[in-house]
Amino acid sequence: MRAEVEESMADSQGRIALVTGAAQGIGRAIALELAKTGAALALADINEAKLAVVVGEVEAMGGTATAFKLDVSNQESIESGAKAVLDRFGKVDILVNNAGITRDALMMSMKRSDWDLVIAINLTGPFLLTQALLRQMIKNRWGRIVNMASVVGRAGQAGQVNYAASKAGLIGMTRSLAREVASRGITVNAVAPGYIETPMTAVLDEKVSAAMLANIPLARRGTDLDVAQAVAFLASDAASYITGQVLDVNGGMFMG
């Protein structure tokens, strides 16, 4: 049975996967993990130089990857990027809405511009990109959509009202869309990482980092591979009966 599950997770030959925020961190790890499954990759990011490096890494593994410059805060960029991917590959089977940012501040001092930017990239961007690609998934009657949420969207966090709102909103979007498209063979799920070792968390104050670690029952930070493997599972045939769910990857930091 285990061999059958592993085979189903590793068999994405002929499928096209689009990953946003693929130039570094969790997005890069997702790209490399999906490459192992045999999927051809459309890798999107605003940072073309770093994205080219990831494309090279995928190709060195024997995989197929094409880079697309995409600014998920800009509707025109999203629409033109989606068209470019479809023109290149003809379809998108797997969509991973991974791109995201933080702009932390306490509520009383948070700038409206920081609220707007976080919502634009973390929530509106996934909405627009999913909308741009959904029709062809419905036509093909198969699709996997995986949205990158966060433990912060599940439990909240002081100083991150914008980020928490964006990720909680993404979870709500995930569940609602899952109900809309289930009859078309499309699953929609979210992965909610906890304290993961990434460039985004590397800048945290040592005291903040230590306090977060103390709240993790498994007593370690997660890795981008931990998250990438969860995404690859949800994108696979092994997860064909899972939709509208949030897969928490947080070492027990949040249980709910």
What are these model-predicted stretches?
Residues 10-41:
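Canonical Rossmann dinucleotide-binding motif of NAD(H)/NADP(H)-dependent dehydrogenases/reductases
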Residues 48-49, 70-81, 112, 225-226:
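The beta1-alpha1 cofactor-binding region of Rossmann-like NAD(H)/NADP(H)-dependent oxidoreductases
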Residues 106-107, 111-119, 212:
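Substrate-binding pocket helix/loop in short-chain dehydrogenase/reductase
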Residues 130, 166, 174:
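Active-site helix of classical SDR
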Residues 135, 179-183, 240:
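Alpha-helical segment proximal to the catalytic Tyr-Lys
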Residues 150:
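Residue(s) in the substrate-gating loop at a strand-loop-helix junction
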Residues 182, 187, 242-244, 250:
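Short, small/polar-rich loop/turn modules that mediate ligand/substrate recognition or access, typified
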